[in-house]
Amino acid sequence: ELFKNINLNLGHEEKIAIIGSNGSGKSTLLKIIAGLISPSEGYMEIFHNKIDSLDDFKKFRNDIAYLPQDVTNHFLCPTVIEDVIFSLRAKGVSKEEALIQGSEILEELKITHLKDRIIFDLSGGEQKIVALAGLLILKPKILLLDEPTNALDEQSEKRIIEILNSIKKSMIIVSHHRSFIDSLTSTVYRLDGKFTRL
């Protein structure tokens, strides 16, 4: 087993970081919290509701947004604006309203200039921000971020830090870059068999 007896309380608009060696289970833990996989045993509580199975998780699906380490398989549409509004359109929001909300998110993240660009022509950092925009448009209460600056250059990392510090959301961030973590939060846990607050 990768880990057991993990207790993690996430407050309103609190940012928590999890560090640990490769293979320690950081990404697996994030996927469990995101409702993508089930723990082999035990349960989770979300907003004081006990979650025993993935079926129990369904009603909280819109409250929790997960950004994977590799976002290249995350995109469903060719252009930035089409992809950012895709989830709203899938929920039945009119194209006109979705475009208004999409434009607001792009402006908030300062990427309006990318609106009509083909996603796969963008840099890795730009793709991460576009993927983040696609999550934020759904107004989740919790963001789960798996290595959000992995393989990014220094300038892109600074931009991600700036964005994450401006977002008023509860977040759990997995990263092995301690300097990145320290620029976001002082609440840091290490997962290496045991789960320890540093």
Task: Give the residues covered by each predicted segment.
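Conserved ABC ATPase signature
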Residues: 118-122, 126
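The feature captures the beta-strand-to-loop junction immediately N-terminal to the Walker
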Residues: 19-21
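Conserved ABC ATPase "signature" region
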Residues: 96-114
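Catalytic Walker B motif of ABC-type/P-loop ATPase nucleotide-binding domains
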Residues: 143-146
